[in-house]
Amino acid sequence: MKIGLLGKKIGMTQIFDPGGKALPVTILKLGPCLITDIKKMESHGYAAIQIGYVKVNGNKLNKAQIGHLNKYNMPLVKFLKEYKVASTENYQIGKWITVEDLSINQNISVSGTSIGKGFTGCIKRHNFSRGPMSHGSKNHRQPGSIGAGTTPGKVFAGKKMAGRMGGKKVTIQNLKIIDIKINNNLIIVKGSVPGKPGNIVSIYQ
């Protein structure tokens, strides 16, 4: 059964494997997530489940969100997300998905919002090389030429220039689950995960 879960990034640390090698790991607190809706191939044209995470008061949601959750008498949840599945036969509305549905040594993909860096130059943002720092040069950290002259007479779209960096959705694939703490809804994955501690993350197989 394909699993998708929402949760929060707790932070990074390191653990040691049986051979004494230090492994960089990230701790994630996932779920429990409630199946709030099921999209079937016959009625919607695709098969998916919708899950909800973090119970909230009604004043935190708009009327459309409250009406959607009240359709099946669901608890009010703040975050909703859909995950496509091959078949919806193994899922029921109102069922809870927890870390118990995951297994150690399983590979998962983790999506989150990367740390925003603000407005940055082309050296930090695109790894440009800087110009000379002496001998009369005034072109230290400038981008250089951004195109030809009269022909084409414009800067082409997508040109690498200074701008906002980070703060975008990033997905890291094939992170290995090292350990699962069922009582605390925690999993430990090898490697790093996008975003700051406390950020909402989405995991799926």
UniProtKB/Swiss-Prot annotation:
Record key words, sorted: Chloroplast, Plastid, Ribonucleoprotein, Ribosomal protein, RNA-binding, rRNA-binding
Residue numbers spanned by region Disordered: 130-150
One Pfam family here: Ribosomal_L3
Cysteines paired by S-S bonds: none
GO biological process: translation
Stored InterPro entries: Ribosomal_uL3 (IPR000597), Ribosomal_uL3_bac/org-type (IPR019927), Transl_B-barrel_sf (IPR009000)
Cellular component, GO annotation: chloroplast; cytosolic large ribosomal subunit
GO molecular function, one term: rRNA binding
Subcellular location: Plastid, Chloroplast
Predominant cellular place of this UniProt entry's protein: plastid
SUPFAM superfamilies found in the cross-reference section: Translation proteins
Record's subunit section: Part of the 50S ribosomal subunit.
Reported function: One of the primary rRNA binding proteins, it binds directly near the 3'-end of the 23S rRNA, where it nucleates assembly of the 50S subunit.
Family that this chain belongs to: Belongs to the universal ribosomal protein uL3 family.
Record protein name field: Large ribosomal subunit protein uL3c
Gene responsible for this protein: rpl3
